[in-house]
């Protein structure tokens, strides 16, 4: 029976053009006979590809034995096993785990855990309800997560529903935020001072936590932290007895070359949020981990965590995630991710960076972004109304290209600033990476060739000529 389009998509006038009928490896097979190369693992999710038999078997076995039981009444071996694995994966630096269903949900749980921690102290600090996040960040689509985020396209329609107990400071972005002539050490010091100033502006006793993506995700396009950034930020948090929450929903669970992205930053969070690649798309699952400091406040207070959801610690999701993580560990995939990631980064820079409208290529592991600008010198973004990122994605999905690129915008000011992510499954080979880069290059070349022959290009080139004389202020990733 053919679909009747009863499913509500984000755009009422459009729906996904391709109906996927089957999958194999890193490819998606459409109903019209095309084979889409998934260069983005969906949204950095399907890290083991689409047909891992061991994970499928683990899900089926769990479905047959214990498909579901109420997480408030019972426990299951699958959920206990996944929580144990997650805690052990941090070498004991994190102490407990909460299992959730999505990244947005996990962020909500992290906020509630942080607030509850301060309420449970021997001398409760109930005034701590303010969260500081980063300009240009994205933490999810639910209302609490939207409070933290700065992706204006998705946030602004709901601003009247969103809590005002949050504020933003500049993110660490060497491409967009670092000043000419400013070395890394000075830039990091400036960002740390900005956070310190924000604590003082809000009132140190009112701030609950600073929340950041360890490596920027879809909104910022893999914004990379400089060496020393997170230790400096953690020092500010500790100075005022606030918590550090790291959101690794997109960049974590091996995506950047270590199981946890913070392992490369010489810092340990108080609360860690993971998702996406945790279950590799074989089940909807995410998790929140807390350190011993939070566990101690709960234990000493003798009070619980006032939170519960129907599908928390879902046994099928836990079984899938546990098997996924065991495969990543047992097959030494982290080494492969680092190797293939280095190759992917070098080939992207070699093939795409010389193109006139590619401003920056950044990333690590199998997590890379390509940002587009009208002018490499001024870094001016393309007009938001042009929808360049959508044009690139649409061409990639069309016949003759057949590659999925994770397109996004907002990296400049929350609206404009076009980029796409390339974050393929961990199972890619060198040949796969080469094919991804070549198809991507053709998409970019042909999209700009077509744009160059269009009427809209005259307006863009006129603005480019102005930019050559008048350097625009750099607005992305910098707090107003």
Where are each of the predicted segments found?
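Conserved N-terminal phosphate-binding loop of PLP-dependent enzymes in the Aspartate aminotransferase
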Residues: 1-480
């Amino acid at each position: 029976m053919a679909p009747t389009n009863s499913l509500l998509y984000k755009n009422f006038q459009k729906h996904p053009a391709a109906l996927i009928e089957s999958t194999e490896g890193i490819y998606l097979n459409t109903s019209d006979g095309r084979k889409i190369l998934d260069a983005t693992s969906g949204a950095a999710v399907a890290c083991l590809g689409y047909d891992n038999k061991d994970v499928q078997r683990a899900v089926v076995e769990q479905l047959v034995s214990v498909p579901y039981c109420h997480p408030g009444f019972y426990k299951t071996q699958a959920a206990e096993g996944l929580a144990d694995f997650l805690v052990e994966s941090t070498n004991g630096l994190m102490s407990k785990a909460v299992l959730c269903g999505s990244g947005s949900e996990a962020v909500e749980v992290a906020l509630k855990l942080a607030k509850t921690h301060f309420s449970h102290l021997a001398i409760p600090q109930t005034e701590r309800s303010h969260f500081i996040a980063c300009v240009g960040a994205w933490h999810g689509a639910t209302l609490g997560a939207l409070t933290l985020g700065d992706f204006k396209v998705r946030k602004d329609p709901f601003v009247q529903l969103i809590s005002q107990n949050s504020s933003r400071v500049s993110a660490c972005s060497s491409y967009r935020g670092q000043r000419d002539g400013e070395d890394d050490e000075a830039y990091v010091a400036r960002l740390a001072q900005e956070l310190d100033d924000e604590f003082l502006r809000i009132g140190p006793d009112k701030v609950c936590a600073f929340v950041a993506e360890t490596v920027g995700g879809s909104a910022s396009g893999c914004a990379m932290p400089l060496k020393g950034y997170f230790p400096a930020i953690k020092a500010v948090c500790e100075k005022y007895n606030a918590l550090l929450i790291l959101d690794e929903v997109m960049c974590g669970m091996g995506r950047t070359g270590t199981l946890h992205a913070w392992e490369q930053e010489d810092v340990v969070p108080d609360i860690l949020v993971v998702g996406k690649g945790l279950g590799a798309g074989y089940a909807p699952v995410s998790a929140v981990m807390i350190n011993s400091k939070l566990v101690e406040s709960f234990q000493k207070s003798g009070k619980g965590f006032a939170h519960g959801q129907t599908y928390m610690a879902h046994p099928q999701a836990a079984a899938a995630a546990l098997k996924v993580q065991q495969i990543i560990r047992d097959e030494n995939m982290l080494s492969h991710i680092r190797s293939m990631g280095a190759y992917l980064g070098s080939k992207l820079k070699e093939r795409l960076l010389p193109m006139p409208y590619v401003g920056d290529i950044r990333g690590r592991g199998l997590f890379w972004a390509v940002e587009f600008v009208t002018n490499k010198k001024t870094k001016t973004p393309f007009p938001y109304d042009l929808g360049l990122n959508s044009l690139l994605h649409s061409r990639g999905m069309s016949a003759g290209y057949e590659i999925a690129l994770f397109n996004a915008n907002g990296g400049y000011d929350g609206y404009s600033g076009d980029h796409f992510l390339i974050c393929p499954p961990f199972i890619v080979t060198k040949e796969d990476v080469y094919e991804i880069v070549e198809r991507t290059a053709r998409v970019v070349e042909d999209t700009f060739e077509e744009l160059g022959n269009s009427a809209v290009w005259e307006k863009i080139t006129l603005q480019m000529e102005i930019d050559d004389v008048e350097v625009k202020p750099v607005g992305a990733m910098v707090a107003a």
